Structure formats: C-alpha cells, structure tokens
C-alpha cells in the first residue's frame, strides 16, 4: 500500500496558493484493508474513505470506463493492481494530475508542472470528452486562475466545444450544474466562467437566458459597450469587486434578462425590461434549484434597479412603499445587497467603471430616517388597531420627506 497527496492540494502548493483540502490516493489496497485500519467508507460509486483522526479523504486508485450518458455514466475499477499513472490518466487537467508522496517526491507523468509554469489549462487525455461536467470545471478553473494569466489550450477548448454539441450537457443534473455555478461565482473573476461557456457553446445549452443577451443592443449614450451580454459580464465583474456575497453576484448576473425579450422594433430601448425579466429568473432558479435567498434578491434587483438609479426623483411615499415591498424593516441587509448590485450595474459600463454611485448613500439616509420612527410613540398617542399602521406609514413618509428637504405631506 502506498499513499499519495493528489489533485488541488499539490497544484495549489506548486502555485504557492493557500491549500484548503487535502485529498489522498491509495495504491495497492483493498476496501477491507482500509476498514481494518480504522478508515470509514463513504463513497457509494467508488471506494472513498475518511481518515479516522483527520477526517480527510482517501480514495483507492481507480480507472473509469464510460458506460452511459452524463456525469455518472461510468463503471469503476478500484482493484489493488491499478497504478498511480492509470489513476492520474483519468483526471481532467494535467495541472490536477500531479501526485506527491510522503517524502515530498512529485510524480508528474502528464507534464502538469510544465503546464503550471506555462499557465495552461490542458486536458490529460481524449477521455476528457467522456465527462460533460468537465466543461463546467475547466470554465471554473479559467475563472479562478484568470488573475494568474491562465489560458485554456486550444485543443482542450476544441474538446469542450465537441462536448457542448454532443447533447451530453443535457444529462447533467441540476445539482451538479448549480454547484459549479456557485463555485464559479465565488471566484475573483466569475465573468470568465460565462465567457468560456459562451466560447465553447455551452452557455446556449445550459443558460440560454444569458446567451440570449449577447447581440442585443442598448442605447449608446447610456451604454457605450452597447451589447447587453457584454454589459452583463461587466456588471458581474464589478459585483465581484464590490462584494464576496454570491447572492449579490447572482443578482448582478440575471438583472437584465428581460432585455432579451424587448421587441426588435423598439431596440435599442428596453421599456419595462425589469418586470419582463422576473419570469425568466423564476424559471432559471427553479430549473437549477437555486437557493431562495439568491432568487429573492435577484427578483428584487431585477424589479427595482431602474428605480434605484433614479432614486432622487421618487416621491417619499414611493420610497416607503419600496421599503415595505422589499421587507427592509425585517431584513435590512437586503437593502445593502440591493444597493451593491445596483452600483455594479451602474459601473458595469465601458468607461464608467470608476464612477461614484451617490444613490446608495441617499437611500441609506432615507431608510435610516424611516426606521427611526418608533411604534411605541404612536401607541402612546392613543392610536389603536389599524390606525397604528396608518400613522406609522405617515410618520415614515414625513421622515423621508425631511431627508429629501421637502415639506412633510399633510396627514389624511
């Protein structure tokens, strides 16, 4: 029995990046031997064991043979005779096919170290096309390592294109697609994930709502970048710079889906695109089982981003209605999330990336003023039942009016 550190831990150590997870490969062992040493078996499809003390994963060396469509369509051979080289051959990229023994010796049969130095994402073998999930994984690695100047090898991108056209992507489960999406949103450059998917044809298959935005024009005076798809990528890039909250990044990604539905005769204008996008967001979230908190924020941003941009033009009572509708009273963090997404939208335009967004501070002031109204003071004045709610609303509007520098509206 011989144990090797494999995969991301070796790769990230060589890149001098923080190592989060340690995965190990065991050559020359049987499940019975692992169990006798106190390891706990957790793998259903192939033998994976947890170390009795550290809880780290130890997988028996294995080979895989394609037997059916999709991510799980493989038969596995994890016999003790499977070699280190055979196991590494089944992996997706050369940079993920490097092993290290307990003495620190590196094993690199497929030249992953050279590709790390060249900053290239390259497939290990043509068996790459047997697993459609690898299209998403490579796109995610391209996003994750974009700051290190990694690029995808042309021959690998060609295989990704072949996979995207094969119909195999449709066999991926919603959970697997969403997991890769969420991991991609967590990177410093999530827009690269979608740009790569578009380049290889996978965006149209998995995220047609986003693909549909490319080629849709916007008014050049507001959007020097013109193309809605390019704008969306720029907004996502800005959102990643402004916040590490994935729900904000997701909202930025889908905020303009409705523009793809604008009648051609009305282009480049997009009247009511916020409201038109709501059903598209609901459908996408249902399809990939996106968490409710992501969905709800995305719907709010889609519905209200145009109002937020022109917030100083809105009446005080309209603002209080917005606070009610968005339930900011109970979820004040949602206001911050909304404003960050809207700021990203404003900055996600060619040449306007450094522009200030004063709307955020203004709306925060309005909300702080409205929030300062206390229910107990209204009750102390003798109001009861429905009157309390009415007076609370009146006083909140008055406080917002004061922020706007206007005279309070007469109570009715």
Swiss-Prot record:
InterPro entries membership: CCA_bact, HD/PDEase_dom, HD_domain, NT_sf, PolA_pol_head_dom, PolyA_RNA-bd, tRNA_CCA-adding_enzyme
SUPFAM superfamilies for the chain: Nucleotidyltransferase, Poly A polymerase C-terminal region-like
Pfam families: HD, PolyA_pol, PolyA_pol_RNAbd
Cofactor note: Magnesium is required for nucleotidyltransferase activity.
Residues binding Mg(2+), per UniProt: 21, 23
Keywords linked to the UniProt accession: ATP-binding, Hydrolase, Magnesium, Metal-binding, Multifunctional enzyme, Nickel, Nucleotide-binding, Nucleotidyltransferase, RNA repair, RNA-binding, Transferase, tRNA processing
Lineage: Bacteria, Pseudomonadati, Pseudomonadota, Gammaproteobacteria, Alteromonadales
Quaternary assembly: Monomer. Can also form homodimers and oligomers.
Reactions catalysed, as given in the entry: a tRNA precursor + 2 CTP + ATP = a tRNA with a 3' CCA end + 3 diphosphate; a tRNA with a 3' CCA end + 2 CTP + ATP = a tRNA with a 3' CCACCA end + 3 diphosphate
Source organism (scientific name): Shewanella pealeana (strain ATCC 700345 / ANG-SQ1)
Reported cofactor(s): Mg(2+); Ni(2+)
Annotated CTP binding sites: 8, 11, 91, 137, 140
Family: Belongs to the tRNA nucleotidyltransferase/poly(A) polymerase family. Bacterial CCA-adding enzyme type 1 subfamily.
Gene that this sequence comes from: cca
Descriptive protein name: Multifunctional CCA protein
Other comment: A single active site specifically recognizes both ATP and CTP and is responsible for their addition.
GO BP terms in the entry: RNA repair; tRNA 3'-terminal CCA addition
Free-text function comment from the UniProt entry: Catalyzes the addition and repair of the essential 3'-terminal CCA sequence in tRNAs without using a nucleic acid template. Adds these three nucleotides in the order of C, C, and A to the tRNA nucleotide-73, using CTP and ATP as substrates and producing inorganic pyrophosphate. tRNA 3'-terminal CCA addition is required both for tRNA processing and repair. Also involved in tRNA surveillance by mediating tandem CCA addition to generate a CCACCA at the 3' terminus of unstable tRNAs. While stable tRNAs receive only 3'-terminal CCA, unstable tRNAs are marked with CCACCA and rapidly degraded.
EC number(s) stated in the UniProt entry for this protein: 2.7.7.72, 3.1.3.-, 3.1.4.-
Domain HD: 228-329
Domain notes: Comprises two domains: an N-terminal domain containing the nucleotidyltransferase activity and a C-terminal HD domain associated with both phosphodiesterase and phosphatase activities.
Positions contributing to ATP binding: 8, 11, 91, 137, 140
CDD domains assigned to the protein according to its UniProt record, in alphabetical order: HDc, NT_ClassII-CCAase
